[in-house]
């Protein structure tokens, strides 16, 4: 949600800012803007509702000189999407400009106080309150911009990542963070600021990740300085980010989502590389090896996640309970943190997040740590907030995921959970050697299996045309594939805007069957497992009521094939890995239906890639 970019150095700032904003478009936004200090010291703010391309058109003919600037893509929280509410925001005197991600919870109190001191406001945002508070402190207290930011943020309740520049100062950006991501790229005599380091990766691979409660003083003529709100010196810890520009491009595909679907054979290879021996099938996860005692002593494992990551966690529940015989609970992070959960020191809390910045999941991590639990993270983005806040963890290593609808991150998360279950199960002695080797071997073979499944692309594209104008879908699955049904339904609703719901197949008769008619398609996952015959019976019930059935079946299936109107035939792997195999054709089905409907597949309406506000 929202994106921040900043630059100070020897280059022209505007091209750097605009390129960075384009790289952040995947996060979801409704308006964009830039602020720059020109060579004459003038502070210029340009912003508009719409896409970054609309901003570029708006900037034609404007004064864009200067080597310092900040830029922003906004996802509306306070105030409707329009030009006035877009960022950056001027202070009332237009001497200071600010960009801000997050939510200021006590903005109303602060705004009332400023209005009593004569301030008026152009917008209805909480962010404009913050920039005017900084200006008020600066002018009444005769302090520096840094001191004004420090004093202002001591009064703020809420989350923020912000950057501030001021008229006449061509050398310095003040930036701060609390519960919202911020990274600073370090170059030769120049600095790059971003809410996602990947947006400026072409300029540097050296990054400092700002921690909660820290303020960065970014001056082109001085080393980077980190201080706290109380003016204690912070640590400048430079991390190397290994990423190539090609990972951020479409590579000839029409959409990032399609590219990321087709990358999955490779991303599974990257996910398991060095973690499973092709000779002995031994699974080694350093996060388990280094914390063996914690896993052996665990009374319970609790997953906390949101969205697609929550669906992956449901599969993780099956994996760990079946293989490790440890009780597992799966919680929505947004609910977990507010219901006073019972967490003990012998619990393990596993936080799952692609970005590692999901606000509710990060808050759940902090709650679990305060309760004394051991917290393990499963993330994609190296150096992310959750990766740094957890006691240990495992990266999924699937590379940048730009499409808002998650695809390769989901299969990567499930792959890591399978390896985690095997590693812990062997340590506990709860998995047979035969099954251990079967699953480990299956993981090594997954890339080839997914290449095979992706060969269904043309078949699924043709099938999608039949259902483009459906208004509702039901997805059914059982066991390991109930979460897969949930995920398939989520993919469809996210990018096509068709209402879709996932159910355990047996639960259909407890309500959802009332919806079945010839205008309600059902996607039924009926691959071989111990519930196959039951699922086949559920499909017959749908058929008897005139429902259209798309069945995901094994290639050698002869039973369900006769009941379904259409089939998607997939290769069979060991039971616990079937969700990875089945999810790929469901991703393709959602993709092609959305394309047929002319949807913006990579940036669906109202959605953001990384939900960094509560």
Explain the meaning of each model-derived region.
Residues 257, 548, 561-563, 573-614:
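Generic C-terminus detector
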Residues 264-268, 272-302, 371, 392-521, ...:
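Active-site phosphate/pyrophosphate-binding segments
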Residues 1-250, 254, 266-299, 338, ...:
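Conserved short alpha-helical segments that host acidic/polar catalytic motifs at enzyme active sites
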Residues 4, 98, 164, 175, ...:
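Structural beta-sheet core signal
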Residues 67, 71-84, 279-292, 316-352, ...:
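Glycine-rich oxoanion-binding loops at beta->alpha junctions
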């Amino acid at each position: 949600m929202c994106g921040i970019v900043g630059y100070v150095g020897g280059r022209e700032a505007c091209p750097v800012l605009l390129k960075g904003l384009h790289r952040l478009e995947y996060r979801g936004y409704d308006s964009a803007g830039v602020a720059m200090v020109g060579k004459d010291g003038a502070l210029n703010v340009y912003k508009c509702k719409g896409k970054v391309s609309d901003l570029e058109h708006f900037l034609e003919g404007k004064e864009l000189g200067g080597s310092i600037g900040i830029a922003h893509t906004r996802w509306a929280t306070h105030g409707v999407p329009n030009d006035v509410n877009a960022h950056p925001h001027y202070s009332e005197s237009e001497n200071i400009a600010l960009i801000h991600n997050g939510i200021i919870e006590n903005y109303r109190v602060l705004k009332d106080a400023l209005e009593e001191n004569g301030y008026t406001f152009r917008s209805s945002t909480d962010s404009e309150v913050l920039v005017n508070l900084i200006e008020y402190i600066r002018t009444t207290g005769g302090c520096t911009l840094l001191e004004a930011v420090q004093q202002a943020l001591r009064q703020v309740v809420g989350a923020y990542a912000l950057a501030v520049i001021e008229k006449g100062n061509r050398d310095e950006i003040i930036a701060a963070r609390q519960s919202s991501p911020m990274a600073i790229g370090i170059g030769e005599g120049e600095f790059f600021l971003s809410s996602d380091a990947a947006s400026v990766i072409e300029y540097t691979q050296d990054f400092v990740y700002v921690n909660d409660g820290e303020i960065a003083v970014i001056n082109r003529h001085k080393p980077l300085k980190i201080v706290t709100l109380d003016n204690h010196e912070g640590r400048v810890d430079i991390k190397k980010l290994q990423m190539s520009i090609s990972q951020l491009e479409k590579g000839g595909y029409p959409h990032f989502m399609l590219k990321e679907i087709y990358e999955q054979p490779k991303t599974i290879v990257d996910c398991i590389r060095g973690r499973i021996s092709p000779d002995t099938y031994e699974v080694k996860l350093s996060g388990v090896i280094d914390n063996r005692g914690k896993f052996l002593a665990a009374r319970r494992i609790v997953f906390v996640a949101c969205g697609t990551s929550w669906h992956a966690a449901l599969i993780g529940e099956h994996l760990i309970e079946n293989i490790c015989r440890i009780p597992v609970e799966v919680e929505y992070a947004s609910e977990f943190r507010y219901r006073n959960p019972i967490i003990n020191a012998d619990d393990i809390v596993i936080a799952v997040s692609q970005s590692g910045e999901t606000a509710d999941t990060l808050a759940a991590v902090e709650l679990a740590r305060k309760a004394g639990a051991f917290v393990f993270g499963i993330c994609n983005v190296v150096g992310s907030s959750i990766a740094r806040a957890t006691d240990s963890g495992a990266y999924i290593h699937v590379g940048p995921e730009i499409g808002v609808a998650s695809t390769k991150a989901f299969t990567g998360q499930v792959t890591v959970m399978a390896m985690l279950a095997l590693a812990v199960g062997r340590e506990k002695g709860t998995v047979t050697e035969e099954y251990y080797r079967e699953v480990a071997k299956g993981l090594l073979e997954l890339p080839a299996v997914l290449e095979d499944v992706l060969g269904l692309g043309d078949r699924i594209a043709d099938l999608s045309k039949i259902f483009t104008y459906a208004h509702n879908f039901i997805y059914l699955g059982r066991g390991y594939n109930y979460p897969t049904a949930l995920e398939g339904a989520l993919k469809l609703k996210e990018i096509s805007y068709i209402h879709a719901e996932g159910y355990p197949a047996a639960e259909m008769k407890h309500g959802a069957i009332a919806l079945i008619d010839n205008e309600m398609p059902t996607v039924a996952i009926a691959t071989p497992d111990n519930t196959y015959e039951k699922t086949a019976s559920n499909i017959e019930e749908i058929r008897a009521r005139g429902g259209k059935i798309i069945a995901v079946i094994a290639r050698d299936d002869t039973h369900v094939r006769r009941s379904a109107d259409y089939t998607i035939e997939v290769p069979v792997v060991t039971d616990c890995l079937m969700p990875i195999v089945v999810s790929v054709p469901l991703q393709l089905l959602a993709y092609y239906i959305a394309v047929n409907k002319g949807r913006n597949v990579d940036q669906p309406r109202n959605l953001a890639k990384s939900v960094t506000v509560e």
